[in-house]
Amino acid sequence: MNKRGALLSLLLLSASVSAFAASTESKSVKFPQCEGLDAAGIAASVKRDYQQNRIVRWADDQKKVGQADPVAWVNVQDVVGQNDKWTVPLTVRGKSADIHYQVIVDCKAGKAEYKPR
């Protein structure tokens, strides 16, 4: 009986560690043309990209927030950047939880990296 309990505890621990590691990985994606945009334009682009392209493809985000169409927002005053490279804090709110990303956008390269905060 003790061996079963120890084995079950080990399995649960390893599953939770791997789930935590998966949730802290950053996700690199292609990003639409954004050269020349200001902070408000970048904020709108990041929000639109997440709602139209990311949530529909990232099942782990849907599961975490508890819905397929969560609310996403960016506080424009927190957006910083120069030379078409931006850092955008994105908050995604669902029925079950919130997800916070630090989105690093490189407009010239056409890429963005979503890093969990």
Swiss-Prot record:
Tell me the leader sequence span.
Answer: 1-21
GO CC field: extracellular region
Q: Which Pfam families match?
A: YebF (PF13995)
Q: Gene3D superfamilies of this UniProt entry?
A: YebF/Colicin-M immunity protein
YebF/Cmi domain location, by residue?
A: 30-117
What UniProt keywords are attached to this protein's entry?
Answer: Disulfide bond, Secreted, Signal
Report the superkingdom from the record. Answer: Bacteria
Q: What is the protein named?
A: Protein YebF
Q: What is the lineage of its organism?
A: Bacteria, Pseudomonadati, Pseudomonadota, Gammaproteobacteria, Enterobacterales
Per the record, the gene is: yebF
